[in-house]
Regions:
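Low-complexity acidic/polar repeat-biased segments
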Residues: 6-34
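Intrinsically disordered, low-complexity segments enriched in small/polar residues
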Residues: 11, 24-25, 40, 64, ...
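Outer-membrane beta-barrel biogenesis signature
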Residues: 31-75, 217-220
Length: 234
């Protein structure tokens, strides 16, 4: 007989010999907190799928001033690029399963339409965005040394709309809304278990509002305060 761990469902089992009158019998035994490391991989994959393309208004910036290289003319563009590299490390409540994950996200977008009022202060922007995300997570059990690797690769397409009360002076209220449709391919590969593949897709939406108030200025620059709130549906 061997005391190697065996997997079934969400738990790891080990072969143990009975005691006393049952010493001639062998049993598969598990503890409530002795879960498979694949659980950590599934959780890491799901977190990546749900949050990779979640943004705030400040993540997308606004107009960017630049000087044309060939003509020297000053111009502006609404094109923006978001690049994110992220590392996470966590463990389950029992401390038996630990997970480390790395993620890379790239998003690009820009306005397709913009409107201003007669004073050119209030402004409404409408834009499109697209992105790619990749994540890799390694989970391992401190009980038996088993480990699991989870990976995700996905794309997103979305649209956003932003209203500013005073875009010129960058003060006052603002409201930002966006939705994003994403689709992912995910894998989970554990020790002595076949690789599991699955697909995920879904729609995520956000509504954000805030107010920017200038507090003052000095030789080093201007000082602002901006209370804000965001509600995300996923």
């Amino acid at each position: 007989y061997t005391t190697l761990f065996r997997s079934a469902g969400a738990f790891e089992y080990r072969l143990v010999r009975g005691e006393g009158a049952n010493s001639n019998h062998w049993y598969l035994k598990t503890e409530d907190d002795q879960v498979r490391p694949e659980i950590g991989s599934y959780i890491a994959n799901e977190e990546s799928v749900q949050t990779s393309f979640v943004t705030r208004q400040l993540d997308r910036g606004g107009k960017t001033e630049y000087t044309d290289f060939f003509t020297g003319e000053k111009k502006s563009t609404s094109l923006w690029l978001r690049q994110v590299g992220r590392y996470n490390s966590w463990q389950d409540s029992s401390g038996n399963t630990k997970t480390r994950s790395n993620r890379y996200i790239s998003q690009i977008g820009g306005d397709i339409a913009a409107w201003t009022d007669a004073e050119n202060q209030q402004a409404l922007h409408l834009g499109l965005m697209a992105g790619y995300a990749h994540s890799r997570a390694i989970s391992h059990s401190v009980v038996n040394g088993q480990r699991s690797i989870g990976k995700t690769d996905g794309y997103g397409l979305g649209m956003y709309a932003t209203w500013f009360e005073d875009e010129i002076n960058q003060q006052g209220a603002y409201v930002d809304a966006w939705f994003n449709y994403s689709w992912f391919k995910s894998t989970v590969n554990g020790n002595d278990n076949p690789k599991e593949k699955y697909r995920s897709r879904g729609l995520t939406g956000s509504l954000e509002a805030g107010y920017t108030q200038k507090l003052g200025s000095n030789n080093y620059g201007d000082w602002y305060v901006q209370p804000q709130a965001q509600v995300i549906w996923m």
